[in-house]
Amino acid sequence: MVVKAVCVINGDAKGTVFFEQEDNGAPVKVTGEVTGLGKGLHGFHVHEFGDNTNGCMSSGPHFNPHSKEHGAPGDENRHLGDLGNIEASGSGPTAVNITDSKITLVGANSIIGRTVVVHADPDDLGKGGHELSKTTGNAGARIGCGVIGIAKI
């Protein structure tokens, strides 16, 4: 059974991101567009809470139910919410086109109800050697966010 979700991102960065999972255990396709980004890479993560009462800051840390270190999307040792980077050209909207086999839209570790956060800086994928590399990817300020909600199929 196909499950779909949507996230409307607000802040300095704005956009709409769609999530689609064909079946339980299937990869999740993440597509959409984000505007308001400077040229370059920007960290793109799912954070633990669907709470935006204090802007993006109340969304908590990266979604990490297995208590792992921060990493790249293809790493075995990564937070579930680690979706890597999106790349902005500096003009026009930035396309989001990610397929991830670790996140899910169903079950106990579903990302529905959690927050997508777009960061000001590149995610170093846990390999930057900075004190924040293994927790946040040293991706900088939270410049846009939105709660992931169930979408009509």
Curated annotation (Swiss-Prot):
Subunit (UniProt): Homodimer.
Intracellular or extracellular location(s): Cytoplasm
GO cellular component: peroxisome
GO biological process terms held by the UniProt record: determination of adult lifespan; positive regulation of mitophagy; regulation of synaptic plasticity
Cofactor note: Binds 1 copper ion per subunit.
Binding site for Cu cation: 45, 47, 62, 119
PROSITE patterns named in the record: SOD_CU_ZN_1, SOD_CU_ZN_2
InterPro entries: SOD-like_Cu/Zn_dom_sf, SOD_Cu/Zn_/chaperone, SOD_Cu/Zn_BS, SOD_Cu_Zn_dom
Stated name of the protein: Superoxide dismutase [Cu-Zn]
Family statement drawn from the similarity comment of this UniProt entry: Belongs to the Cu-Zn superoxide dismutase family.
SUPFAM superfamilies (UniProt xref): Cu,Zn superoxide dismutase-like
Transmembrane segments: none
Main location: cytoplasm
Required cofactor names: Cu cation; Zn(2+)
Gene from which this protein is expressed: Sod1
MF GO annotations: copper ion binding; protein homodimerization activity; superoxide dismutase activity
Keyword Repressor appears in the UniProt entry: no
Catalyzed reactions: 2 superoxide + 2 H(+) = H2O2 + O2
Disulfide bonds: 56-145
Family matches, as Gene3D superfamilies: Superoxide dismutase, copper/zinc binding domain
Functional summary from the UniProt entry: Destroys radicals which are normally produced within the cells and which are toxic to biological systems.
